[in-house]
């Protein structure tokens, strides 16, 4: 019964994923018909035309980034929730995304000031270092604080400190760079380029493959550290791999499109409820698909709701994701009475 439910959910998610991909590519300030899209993609017709440039240089990389980054952030959230054994953990709430944001902001601001440009590889490295530093601090605190509520407060305080430090660094940026930095810091898919997207896709593909190889240890760890150790899992190395993969995935997203809120918490929860299971072999691909659907839908709303004005992606993800987290927190609180 559960296998049938999972298969049906995957099929529905795959159809929604494909439909949203098609709708997002075709709609916007410049509408493109399915006929135009197919001719450009399959026959490469119309090179140099407005439709060709809009589709291949702006719309397609943006939509693909929304699909992949949404799935990536959801998987990152699932790994963090497994690590802390709490469904309210996530890269944004625990300050991991904010740490990556601070490091990237510092590198971009001072790199542009000193050298005039910053390689995307340096941006990704900075994001990973910032994410790992914040995650390490949260791990140290988690050993001393056994209340998840207090740990979340600590994570939010880390996020506030990192955001304040980023705003401080922005005061040293060139006026020409401030608008781009502000847009990036609020989360946006609008500046995605094929070159940067390819780098992120390569890193994400390796990380997701490693996640699939860790499916059995993750399943054992869900029953507790002692059970995992009894099943032959090297818990210390496994925990290091789990937090490292989660931070690297979150760093890829932050480096490319900036911090995005609530996706890493809301989507894993919705995936488990949808599939009716918490088994990692089922949840991991489900998280990726639902995360892609969620982010594509939010990006489409951000682009079209008040066109030509564009909303920050985190504004839309928070609008739809926050109620899910509130419901989750209420149910969790009710279960502990």
Predicted regions span which residues?
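Alpha-helical transmembrane segments in inner-membrane proteins
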Residues: 1-337
């Amino acid at each position: 019964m559960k296998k049938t439910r999972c298969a049906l959910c995957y099929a529905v998610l795959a159809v929604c994923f494909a439909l949203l991909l098609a709708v997002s590519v075709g709609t916007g300030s410049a509408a493109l018909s399915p006929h135009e899209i197919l001719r450009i993609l399959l026959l490469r017709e119309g090179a140099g035309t407005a439709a060709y440039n809009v589709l291949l240089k702006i719309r397609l990389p943006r939509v693909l980034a929304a699909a992949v980054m949404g799935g990536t952030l959801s998987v990152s959230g699932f790994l963090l929730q497994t690590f802390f054994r709490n469904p309210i953990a996530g890269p944004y709430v625990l300050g991991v995304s904010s740490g990556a944001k601070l490091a990237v902001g510092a590198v971009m601001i001072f790199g542009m000031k000193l050298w005039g440009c910053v390689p995307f590889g340096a941006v990704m490295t900075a994001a990973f270092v910032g994410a790992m530093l914040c995650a390490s601090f949260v791990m140290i605190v988690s050993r001393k604080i056994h209340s998840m509520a207090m740990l979340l407060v600590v994570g939010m305080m880390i996020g506030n400190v990192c955001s304040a430090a980023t705003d401080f660094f922005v005061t040293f940026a060139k006026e020409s760079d401030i608008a781009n930095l502000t847009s990036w810091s609020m989360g946006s898919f609008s500046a995605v380029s094929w070159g940067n997207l390819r780098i992120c896709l390569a890193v994400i593909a390796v990380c997701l493959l490693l996640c699939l190889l860790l499916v059995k240890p993750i399943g054992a760890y869900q029953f507790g550290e002692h059970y995992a150790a009894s099943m032959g899992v090297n818990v210390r190395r496994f925990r290091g791999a789990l937090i490292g993969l989660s931070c690297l995935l979150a760093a890829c997203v932050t480096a490319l499109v900036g911090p995005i809120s609530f996706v890493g918490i809301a989507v894993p929860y919705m995936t488990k409820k949808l599939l009716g299971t918490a088994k990692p072999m089922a949840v991991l691909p489900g998280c990726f698909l639902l995360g892609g659907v969620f982010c594509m839908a939010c990006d489409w709303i951000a682009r079209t709701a008040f066109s030509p004005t564009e909303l920050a992606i985190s504004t839309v993800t928070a609008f739809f994701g926050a109620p899910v987290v509130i419901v989750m927190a209420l149910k969790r609180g009710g279960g502990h009475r």
